[in-house]
From Swiss-Prot:
It comes from Paracidovorax citrulli (strain AAC00-1). It is an enzyme of class 2 (transferase). It catalyses: adenosine(37) in tRNA + dimethylallyl diphosphate = N(6)-dimethylallyladenosine(37) in tRNA + diphosphate. Substrate binds at residues 36-41. It comes from the Bacteria. Its cofactor is Mg(2+). ATP binds at residues 34-41. This is tRNA dimethylallyltransferase. Keywords: ATP-binding, Magnesium, Nucleotide-binding, Transferase, tRNA processing. SUPFAM superfamilies: P-loop containing nucleoside triphosphate hydrolases. The lineage of its organism: Bacteria, Pseudomonadati, Pseudomonadota, Betaproteobacteria, Burkholderiales. The keyword Oxidoreductase does not apply.
């Protein structure tokens, strides 16, 4: 993993302004992104403490897993004490049976930012769902809604032929989308083929932007600077991921998924149950029901491997955002550097 762009100790360098030019407007809100286990929650809370004498902070979660109630351990959800110390939004807003789309996130986040600003607080958007961040800046086209009949047909086809066969089908109708998806990425393959069958358009065609949309995205980036926590050493992040997964197992993650399975109305193809860790735990519990033995070592191995892959995808997304301010999350003073950079961007003395 290459070293992310470095920041000086004070954070974002002050812009060079022509003589007589007005200083740029201070950002309306801040965003903090990063791969899983990079320290985003700790960083967000540290900034809230540093800003407390100047301005209250409210956190808007940018995480597609934290929206689900009853999924606390496997998502590393902020604790009740952390949520009590700093207001958090877009956490526990859906039952695991319910979907939550990027379009819904954008609408909710934009509304919350306005409400938080009206209260005189700083909106701080924090998370690792890069699609949500991208949708905030670039906007999203009006893609067709989910079609239950088409989804059922695709699931039946996948059961008969396997998801790699559907990935090959996607490559014929939408090679651009297929190129960025793994043959086993059932959720995204299904959605891409669903869009094709419902609209007659490839999913990739919905991501093109007009010039006006591009200008609007540029304005959005100016009003909401993106800071990212990125590791210089991949092994450091892998170690953190393993430690966190072990801690989740110790805290009762398997029992959490067991309770979800016991509801009887959830299944492994739901977006909630496809979340990293939950899918692997669901499969392990299925194996336990079949054989009477829980393959805990296999669950740990597969869960950590899946989380590593998620982190890799998150870093790839971040590197496609050249306007971000990258901070090495594995540096000993990473939290201090992030706080100093954020305070500088806000015009607050460190």
């Amino acid at each position: 993993m290459s070293t992310p762009p470095s920041l000086p100790a004070t954070g974002v360098p002050a812009p060079h302004l022509p003589r007589g030019a007005a200083a740029p407007a201070l950002p309306a809100c801040l965003a903090l992104a990063g791969p899983t286990a990079s320290g985003k929650t700790a960083g967000a809370l540290a900034l809230a403490r540093a800003l407390a004498p100047h301005r209250p902070v409210e956190i808007v979660s940018v995480d597609s897993a934290l929206v689900y109630r009853g999924m606390d351990i496997g998502t590393a959800k902020p604790t009740a004490a952390e949520q009590a110390a700093v207001p958090h939004h877009l956490i526990d807003i859906r039952d695991p049976l319910q979907p939550y789309s990027a379009a819904e996130f954008v609408a909710d986040a934009q509304r919350l930012v306005r409400e938080i600003q009206a209260r005189g607080a700083l909106p701080l958007l924090v998370g690792g769902t890069m699609l949500y961040f991208k949708a905030l800046w670039d906007g999203i086209d009006d893609m067709p809604p989910a079609d239950a009949a088409v989804r059922a047909r695709l699931e039946a086809q996948a059961a008969a032929e396997g998801w790699p066969a559907l990935h090959a089908e996607l490559a014929r109708v939408d090679p651009q989308t297929a190129a960025r998806l793994a043959p086993g990425d059932s959720q995204r393959i299904q959605r891409a083929l669903e869009v094709w069958h419902v609209s007659g358009r490839p999913l990739s065609s919905f991501h093109t932007r007009s010039r006006a949309a591009g200008e609007a995205a540029g304005a959005a980036r100016m009003s909401m600077p993106l800071f990212s926590l990125e590791p210089q050493d991949r092994a450091w992040l892998h170690g953190r991921i393993a430690q966190r997964f072990d801690a989740m197992l110790d805290e009762g993650f398997v029992e959490e998924v067991r309770r979800l399975r016991a509801r009887g109305d959830l299944h492994p193809d739901l977006p909630s149950m496809r979340c990293v860790g939950y899918r692997q735990a669901w499969e392990a519990l299925y194996e336990e029901a079949r054989t009477g033995r829980l393959p805990l070592a296999q669950l740990r191995e597969r869960g950590i491997a899946a989380t590593r892959q998620l982190a890799k995808r998150q870093v790839t997304w971040l590197r496609s955002m050249p306007w971000r301010h990258a901070i090495a999350c594995d540096a000993p003073d990473a939290t201090q550097r992030w706080v100093a950079a954020a305070l500088h961007a806000l015009g607050v003395p460190a």
